Amino acid sequence: DMGELENFRCQLEILLNELNPTDPEESNKGRVKTFLEQTLWPSTTYEINASEKTDLTIKDKNIGRNVVLFEFKKVNSAEMVTKDNLVKKAMFELVLYYILEEHEKKNTSIKHLVISDGYKYFIFEKAEFWELFGKDRKLVSEIKSSENTANEKREYIYNQIIRPKVEAVKDKLSFTFVDLETFAKETSAADIIAKPRFKALFKLFSPIHLQKLPFAEDHNTLNRKFYTELL
C-alpha cells in the first residue's frame, strides 16, 4: 500500500531527525515508541509500553499478550551488543526478560526479541531463544531461584548465570541487523518508497514479520537471506 509506505517514510524521517546520540536511553526509546505507533502498530490493536522489568513491549490487545520484547541502550553504550560481540549486558538483560516472560508469565506468544539504541536493531527470533535459553532447565531454575532477591543479585544473574550461557551459544545466535542511519540521506526523497531496500525495511518492522502474522501471497518471502541481501 503506497499510503502506508509514504507514511513510513515520513515517520522514519521524523525519527531520524529527532534521535540524538547524546540523549539518554529513555528519550530515544520514547521516539522509537512513537515511530512504531504512528506507522504499523496502531493503538487500536497494540499497546506499546515499558512493562515491569522490560524496556519496551508490544502487546497485542486481541490476545492480551506481549508479542515483541525490546531492550534499549544509550547510543555508544559499552553495554550495547555489536555485530561482532553479543556477549554484552544488553543481551543478558534480554535473555532475563525472555525467561521471565516465557516461564513466569507463561507467555508463549512472543515472536521476536530486539536490542536497539534507536538507530541500530538486532532482531532475534523467539524460536531460537527458546532453543538456546528457554529449554535449558538448569538456566531457568537458576534464574528463578535468584530472581526474587535484591537488586545487587541482578548483576549476579547477568554475570554468573546468563553470561556463561551466552558465551557458550553465541556462535549459534543468528539475528537480522539494520542500522536506520544508513537510510538517513534518502528519507527526504519521495522516491525512496519504490526502492527494494526501503520496502524490506518496511516489512521488517511490520506485524507481518515481527508478529509473524499470515500474509498475502504477493509479499516477498520473509526470509533471512532476503533481508541480509537488502539491508
Set out the residue ranges of the language-model regions.
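Charged, often flexible domain-edge or linker segments that flank or initiate folded functional domains
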Residues: 54, 59-87, 93-231
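Charged, often low-complexity linker/regulatory segments
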Residues: 1-50, 199, 224-228
